Structure formats: C-alpha cells, structure tokens
C-alpha cells in the first residue's frame, strides 16, 4: 500500500533519518488514508528522544508543550506537526493518565500502548505499512477492536469507552464482541473522567450517522453520565433522531425534550452558554403553534436562535409540523424584508421619546408598532407610525 505523504511531513522524516533515527506517520492519518477519508493532521513517531529531536530540529520553530511526555510540535511549512518519541507507559493510577512514561527504541512497543487496532498503523516510504495488531484487517471488516486485552485497555483509560462509540458511529463500524463486553462491564469507570472530556466525546457521538444504534445498544453506558435518559425515553426519541441532521445541539435537544431538568444536565456536562441557548430554545418552543405567515413573524420576533436550526429540530420531533409552508413563508419574509424585529422598525426609542413619552411607555409603544407592521408590513414607515402613535395618544 502506497500512501502519499505531504512534502512538509516527508521533510521532517528525512531529517530524522539523515540524523540516524527512524520515523513513521502513525495513527489517524494512516487509518483515514486507507479509508480514503480526509486527513486533517499528521502525527509522527520516532526513536529520537525529545532532547535529540530538539537538536535535529534546531533550525525549525519548535514548541515544547508536551515534552515531558515525549512530544514536541514542529512548525513545518507553517503547519504544526506533533512528533513523539517511541514510548511505553507505566501503571495508570486514575483510569485516565499513566503515572509516567518510559522512552523506547521499539516501534512495536509504542504501538502496543495505543487504544484500537485501527489507530496503531504506521507508515513511511522506505518500510511501507507496518501493522502489528491486525488493524488493516479490522478496517476491511469495519471493526473497532482494542489492542490486546480490552479490559486492560479500558481500565488504563476509561475515555476509550466513549472513543470506541465515537469511532464506531463516525465510521459506521461494529465494536468487536470482547471490546463491547468490556465497555458494558466497565462503564462505571467513566465516573473518573472529567465532564469536559465526556462532553467533547459525546458531541462527537451525537454527530454520527449511527447514533440511533449507539443509543439502543449502549444506553447503559450513556446513562452513566446522563442518568435521566431512561431506556423508554431513549426509545421514544429514536424516530426523531433518525429524521434529524448530524447536528449535536439539535440531537441533544431531541433527547432532552421531555426531561424537566435539561438545563442542569447541560451545565453538568459543561455545555457552553451558546450551546445551551440553542438546545433550550428548541425545547422551549417544541409545541409552538405555527399555521400562518403572521404567526411565523410573531414567533421570529421572540426566537433567539437561527430559524433554520429550530425549523430542522421541529420537523424531526413533529411530522405534523407544516415544514414546507413555514419554509416558504420564511423565504417570503426574508425576500421582501418584512419587519419582525424591533430593529426592523422605521422608528426607534428616540423617535418616541421626541413625541413626549418616557420609560416603559417607550417600550410598550415600540412593541405596539412592531405588532402593527407584522400584520401590515406596508405601514413600516416613520410618518405612518408617528401618526399612529399620535392618534392613540
């Protein structure tokens, strides 16, 4: 198998080789090359120690942020490239981090510490593809399999539970039986993982095509960090999930739609304020009656998220929602620049203040004007609105 390595990566491998060290592209880049998927970054592994790497790349800009673990980042053609010394890891004391790392001269030893067979593939142009653990066979058969004993791999790093689900979902792979058994049996180890890490992996899982099957087959795992999601509530949402796009916020809103403490769950899982706004706004308006263009404009005046997000969410949860009519109305409103927000009005608070109103009166009049132009957009004219205000004075 021949893999095309970019010049900015090959030059780093060549420089290490020139100085007597071996070097390989490792991990996700090789996996994605085999699957003909986009490659977003290239990671290198080498038998050079961090000190030796600093000497080799003395003419490059180097960041030493991970040097205590054997990793440096080299800027090559303005692209950051992580290069890590072959290593083995000591005992894991917290089901997440090794107590220490030991540098190695063995590429096989380095690959042995990785999570899944499909992520332990190495390549360089001189030696070709190196596959110690059957990763290519697992890629061909679409299998996620832990390297070695899956119970040991998960005990070392419990985040591998969610990584397995994410890879299986993203690639539409099946989790191998022994690995799946270990995931179910050791799911409680997720309590050792920070909410931030869980959040990041969970978002990745939500954005996969295989989310419905993951929710069905691994509900017990998901209930470790979202215990409020009962088996029945998950099953109830599956059809909506199937209709939804691969959008993490929309899918989280679907899952939490009928759960009363959604905001607490989102805060517990370290969702950002922006994410919470989208999710909670969708949930809040789940049953909003929308049958006409005027109703849609009134709704848009209160909606604090993009309409296309709400529109997609609403159709996913409600097949009776008149999505084609609402989409047509929405485009009519936008194409004609029909007003539905206070900022769309031809007048503002200063205009009303100039007529003689103060305080809350100004806000009340602005909203009355907005209601007028929502029903009669042709009246969104400063003179017409001022005359209307004076007539009601």
Segments (PLM) and residue ranges:
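Catalytic cores of the polymerase beta-like nucleotidyltransferase superfamily
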Residues: 1-393
């Amino acid at each position: 198998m021949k893999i095309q390595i970019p010049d900015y990566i090959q030059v780093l491998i060549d420089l290490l080789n020139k100085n007597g060290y071996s070097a390989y592209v490792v991990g996700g880049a090789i996996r994605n090359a085999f699957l003909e998927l986009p490659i977003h970054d290239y990671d290198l592994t080498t038998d050079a120690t961090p000190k030796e790497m600093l000497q080799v790349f003395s003419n490059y800009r180097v960041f030493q942020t991970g040097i205590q673990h054997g990793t440096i980042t080299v800027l090559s053609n303005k692209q950051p490239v992580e290069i890590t010394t072959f290593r083995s890891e000591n005992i894991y004391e917290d089901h997440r981090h090794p107590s220490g790392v030991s540098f190695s001269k063995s590429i096989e030893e380095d690959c042995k510490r990785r999570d899944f067979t499909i992520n332990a593939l190495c390549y360089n142009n001189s030696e070709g593809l190196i596959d110690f653990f059957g990763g290519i066979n697992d890629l061909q058969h679409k299998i996620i399999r832990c390297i070695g004993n899956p119970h040991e791999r998960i005990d070392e790093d419990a985040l591998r539970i969610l990584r397995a689900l994410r890879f299986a979902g993203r690639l539409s792979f099946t989790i191998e039986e022994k690995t799946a058994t270990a995931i179910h049996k050791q799911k409680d180890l997720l309590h050792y993982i920070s909410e931030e890490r869980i959040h990041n992996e969970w978002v990745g899982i939500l954005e996969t095509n295989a989310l419905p099957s993951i929710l069905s087959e691994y509900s017990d795992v998901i209930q470790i960090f979202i215990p409020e999601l009962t088996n029945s509530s998950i099953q109830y949402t599956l059809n909506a999930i199937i209709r939804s796009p691969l959008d993490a916020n929309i899918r989280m809103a679907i899952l939490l739609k009928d759960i009363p403490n959604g905001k607490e769950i989102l805060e517990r899982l370290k969702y950002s304020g922006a994410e919470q706004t989208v999710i909670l706004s969708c949930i809040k308006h789940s049953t909003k009656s929308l049958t006409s263009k005027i109703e849609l404009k009134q709704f848009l005046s209160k909606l604090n998220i993009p309409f296309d997000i709400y529109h997609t969410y609403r159709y996913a949860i409600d097949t009776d929602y008149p999505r084609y009519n609402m989409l047509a109305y929405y485009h009519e409103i936008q194409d004609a620049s029909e007003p539905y927000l206070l900022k769309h009005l031809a007048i503002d608070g200063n205009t009303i203040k100039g007529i003689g109103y103060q305080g809350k009166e100004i806000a009340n009049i602005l909203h009355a004007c907005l209601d007028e132009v929502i029903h009669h957009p042709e009246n969104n004219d400063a003179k017409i609105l001022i005359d209307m205000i004076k007539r009601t004075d």
